[in-house]
Amino acid sequence: MQDIYRCKIFIGPIEEAIPFIEQAIRVSPRDPLIANWYFRIGEAHLLQSHNDEAILWFEKARGANAGLPYVHRYLAAAYALKGETERAAAELAEARRLRGEDLTLAQLRATTRYEAPIIRALSEATYLAGLRKAGMPEE
């Protein structure tokens, strides 16, 4: 199940990933890593420009484990894309604090897990565009 959702997130079609993740949550609702499952649903929504749904799931992930810097980064991107710049900046600052160092958009591009050109383009148009609006530097 985990491998199937990864294929859908990383090479598409993204919308087909969500049912697999929801099934994982139903099978193991007390999973100690449940925040990651919530995050993955948010990620799928963000890449499809469903910002409200993405925020809902990223906030749920943050509630389950507030110590994950990447959750705060993705939440910052989603808030910025909605025009909620103060909330975006606060989430980006928390991601930086938790990680202990700043990241740049260039670093994120260089280490992306999105290998398929279509998914990489979606990431650029959503996640990275949102982080840029939230204040993450290019270099």
Give the positions of each predicted feature.
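Alpha-helical protein-protein interaction modules
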Residues: 1-139
